[in-house]
């Protein structure tokens, strides 16, 4: 009765506050060690959550690096986080300590889309047997279906022709290039996963791309981070569907495509694509409870490959065309090299890359300047490690700040400017820099890197072979500042394509 009347509430409230503060202190205990990385003082319960701009993480990390150094700590709720900055520290973390930093932290927000036991995809899977199994399968299967080979090169070149035809239809008129670039790159991934291409005007195709674009921004910001810190909130009925509608819709589309694919799959015939190869592995794994080959994991692996192999490449190409209209002198030099090495009739080939140092340098500089994955995906320590003299305990979430490497002022001559000469020596020969790390490094380096390199070179050279690009007449010069939503995309802009 006292409790109901309110007279017993004060002792309970005091007890609850003391309990929460004790739990909070327990989670802070590692900060008391002398060799733990410095960082801003966390607030009770929330930690540094409100002291970091989650909508502009690269800038927040830049300011914190300037204040606390290349290795600093944060407390996100009760989760300890260490951010690693600069070439030397990131190399030490991902390469020297690679075996002990290849794990992933738990991210409860992904459980709502089917991540669970033996179903964690490949990108976010914990470091262990399941990850190795799926990584090995993905790399070998992509290689078998042409990644790095002439067969896929021809497919990319053919898709580039479709892209150029679509641009020809819009020649001279202002357009946002991202949509067309996204369609072209998606068709390359679709050829590997589903052995098919989509017509650019297909309404279902347009819907898939729209949903995928929307879903990419659902994973960043304050609310997803709060849900990761306090996953009990995900038990609120309907909350996940409201917070992550794009991801759930996209995965439903993936399920429908897989269901259609199963109707025509013949296990007695060689696999047509990655989906067939995965279905064959599911058949082999029947009766093996330890296998990660199952229907639930198929949808997640396909989702990972779309994200890793499509969105990043199309955004990079969108940056490339933006930088060409902002730097017409660079565009002219690339076209001059294309004319000298390839001409205007023959299709570009990967073999041409070795003879085109300036074009190669421009593509690399686009990747460095665009910096589209500034914060990388989080890692986790599987045991106590030491980085740059600081002790980082087992179980700590790690954020390798790739932006701090690609814009490292101690490494690059003009880190904040678009400067292709970063990748050229005094004689004009192409040189690759050790600080060029857009695909990350170590055991968790992007598995789609070989495919991305092929697509970037072939699409970029095909486009500049056929067209000149410029800012539309009467429109202001577009900005080269990016918009952060986990990936760093260029601010929306328009260009005009003119046939050469």
Swiss-Prot record:
Its EC number is 1.14.14.1. Keywords: Endoplasmic reticulum, Heme, Iron, Membrane, Metal-binding, Microsome, Monooxygenase, Oxidoreductase. Induction: P450 can be induced to high levels in liver and other tissues by various foreign compounds, including drugs, pesticides, and carcinogens. It is an enzyme of class 1 (oxidoreductase). Its main location: endoplasmic reticulum. One of its GO terms (molecular function) is monooxygenase activity. It comes from the Eukaryota. It is a peripheral membrane protein. InterPro entries: Cyt_P450, Cyt_P450_CS, Cyt_P450_E_grp-I, Cyt_P450_E_grp-I_CYP2D-like, Cyt_P450_sf, Cytochrome_P450_fam2. Signal peptide: none annotated. Heme binds at residue 446. It is found in: Endoplasmic reticulum membrane; Microsome membrane. Its cofactor is heme. The keyword Iron applies. One of its GO terms (biological process) is xenobiotic metabolic process. Cytochromes P450 are a group of heme-thiolate monooxygenases. In liver microsomes, this enzyme is involved in an NADPH-dependent electron transport pathway. It oxidizes a variety of structurally unrelated compounds, including steroids, fatty acids, and xenobiotics. Belongs to the cytochrome P450 family. This is Cytochrome P450 2D3. It comes from Rattus norvegicus (Rat). The gene is Cyp2d3.
């Amino acid at each position: 009765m006292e409790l109901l009347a309110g007279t017993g509430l004060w002792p309970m409230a005091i007890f609850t506050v003391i309990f929460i503060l004790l739990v909070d202190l327990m989670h802070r205990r590692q900060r008391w060690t002398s060799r733990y990385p410095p960082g801003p003082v966390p607030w009770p319960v929330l930690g540094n959550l409100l002291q970091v701009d989650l909508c502009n993480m690269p800038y927040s990390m830049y300011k914190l690096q300037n204040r606390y150094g290349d290795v600093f700590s944060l407390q996100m709720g009760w989760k300890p986080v260490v951010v690693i900055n600069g070439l030397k520290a990131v190399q030490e973390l991902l390469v020297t300590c690679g075996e002990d930093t290849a794990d992933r932290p738990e991210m409860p927000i992904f459980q709502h889309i089917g991540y669970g036991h033996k179903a964690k995809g490949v990108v976010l899977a914990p470091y262990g047997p399941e990850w190795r199994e799926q990584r090995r399968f993905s790399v070998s299967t992509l290689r078998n279906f042409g990644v790095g080979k002439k067969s896929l090169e021809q497919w990319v070149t053919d898709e580039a022709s479709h892209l150029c035809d679509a641009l020809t239809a819009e020649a001279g008129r202002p357009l946002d290039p991202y949509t067309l670039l996204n369609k072209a790159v998606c068709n390359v991934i679709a050829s590997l996963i589903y052995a098919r291409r989509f017509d650019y005007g297909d309404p279902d195709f347009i819907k898939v791309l729209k949903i995928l674009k929307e879903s990419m921004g659902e994973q960043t910001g304050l609310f997803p981070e709060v849900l990761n810190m306090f996953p009990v909130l995900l038990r609120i009925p309907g909350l996940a569907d409201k917070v992550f509608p794009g991801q759930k819709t996209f995965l439903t589309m993936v399920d429908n495509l897989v269901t259609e694919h199963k109707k025509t799959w013949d296990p007695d015939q060689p696999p047509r694509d990655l989906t067939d190869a995965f279905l064959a592995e599911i058949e082999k794994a029947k009766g093996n409870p330890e296998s990660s080959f199952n229907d639930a994991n198929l949808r997640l692996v396909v989702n990972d490959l779309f994200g890793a192999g499509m969105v990043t490449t199309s955004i990079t190409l969108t940056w490339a065309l933006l930088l060409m209209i902002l730097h017409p002198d660079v565009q002219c030099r690339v076209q001059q090299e294309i004319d000298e090495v390839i001409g205007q009739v023959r299709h570009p080939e990967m073999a041409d890359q070795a003879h085109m140092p300036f074009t190669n340098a421009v593509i690399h500089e686009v990747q460095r300047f665009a910096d589209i994955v500034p914060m990388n995906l989080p890692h986790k320590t599987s045991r106590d490690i030491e980085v740059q003299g600081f002790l980082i305990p087992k179980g700590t979430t790690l954020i390798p700040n790739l932006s701090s490497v690609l814009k490292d002022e101690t490494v690059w001559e003009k880190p904040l400017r678009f400067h292709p000469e970063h990748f050229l020596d005094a004689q004009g020969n192409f040189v690759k820099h050790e600080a060029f790390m857009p695909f990350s490094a170590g055991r968790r380096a992007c598995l789609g890197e070989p495919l991305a390199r092929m697509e970037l070179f072939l699409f970029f050279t095909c486009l500049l072979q056929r067209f000149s690009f410029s800012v539309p007449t009467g429109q202001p010069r577009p900005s080269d500042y990016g918009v952060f939503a986990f990936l760093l995309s260029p601010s929306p802009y328009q260009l005009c394509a003119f046939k050469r």
